Amino acid sequence: MSGLGILVLTLLLLVYMATSHQDAGEKQATQRDAINVRRRRSLTRRVAEECEESCEDEEKHCCNTNNGPSCAPQCFG
């Protein structure tokens, strides 16, 4: 095989390796994002459940405000 053919094959191999490594990194980042979203949802759900339970004792509604969930006789907005 000529030197030019070997050079072309080497370049193709390098390009393939670089793109497959990049794809693996993107896949890993996507999986990490999915895990973070699940954690965030479970935390939000837990806070909402705690708010509802504590407000239920006071016979009020759990309302989301800028400062987080709070108990109020009636939620606005």
From Swiss-Prot:
The keyword Disulfide bond applies. One of its GO terms (molecular function) is toxin activity. Its main location: secreted. InterPro entries: Conotoxin. Residues 1-18 form the signal peptide. The presence of a 'disulfide through disulfide knot' structurally defines this protein as a knottin. This is Conotoxin ArMSGL-0141. It comes from Conus arenatus (Sand-dusted cone).
